[in-house]
Amino acid sequence: MIITITGKPCSGKGTVSKMFCQKYNFEYICTGDMFRALAKENGFDNILTFQLNEDIKKIDALVDNQIIDIGKNRISENIVIDSRLAWHFIPQSFKVFIDVDLNVAAKRLLEANRENENTILSFI
């Protein structure tokens, strides 16, 4: 069974996915990790520089194709995919969407030190 987990930023997608996988012995796949690994393999060590480059579309396509391949060839395996769009590429997956209150998401983002506080507060 393939489970695709998506949701709003800072909703806990990764945390929930990893906890589920550990408890039920599923394989964990994160498309964000796949994307970063492929970007690094293609010479993009600085993600900010990479985001400004047109090659982002090529890496996106590689990740999408890997997810499609998993959906076609590994459908009987126990896998959780933490991804924004895997549900779209694997229509037969069990789909989970995790929601989060905007204030909770902002607090999590601040606590994780992912961004400048002023940038986050302007988002709220």
Residue ranges and their predicted role:
Residues 13:
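Conserved lysine of the Walker
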Residues 5:
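Hydrophobic anchor at the beta1->P-loop junction of P-loop NTPases
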Residues 98:
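Glycine-rich phosphate-binding loops of nucleotide-dependent enzymes
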Residues 2:
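Walker A (P-loop) ATP-phosphate-binding motif of ABC ATPase nucleotide-binding domains
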Residues 23, 27, 31-90, 103-104, ...:
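ATP-dependent small-molecule kinase phosphotransfer cores
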Residues 16, 20:
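Hydrophobic positions on the alpha1 helix immediately C-terminal to the Walker A/P-loop
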Residues 8:
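P-loop (Walker A) phosphate-binding loop of NTP-binding proteins
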